[in-house]
Curated annotation (Swiss-Prot):
GO terms for cellular component: chloroplast thylakoid membrane; photosystem II. A core subunit of photosystem II (PSII), probably helps stabilize the reaction center. It comes from the Eukaryota. The gene is psb30. This is Photosystem II reaction center protein Psb30. It is found in: Plastid, Chloroplast thylakoid membrane. PSII is composed of 1 copy each of membrane proteins PsbA, PsbB, PsbC, PsbD, PsbE, PsbF, PsbH, PsbI, PsbJ, PsbK, PsbL, PsbM, PsbT, PsbY, PsbZ, Psb30/Ycf12, peripheral proteins of the oxygen-evolving complex and a large number of cofactors. It forms dimeric complexes. It comes from Euglena mutabilis.
Length: 33
């Protein structure tokens, strides 16, 4: 297994999961304010 490939896949999944999470957090914070 290529380490570079694993890193790329890991970062991709991280962005796909973290993206919506960050947006939701920001949305909730704005809603609370």
């Amino acid at each position: 297994m290529n380490i570079e490939l694993i890193v790329q896949l890991g970062s991709l999944t991280l962005i796909t999961i973290a993206g919506p999470l960050i947006v939701a957090l920001l949305f909730l914070r704005q809603g609370n304010l």
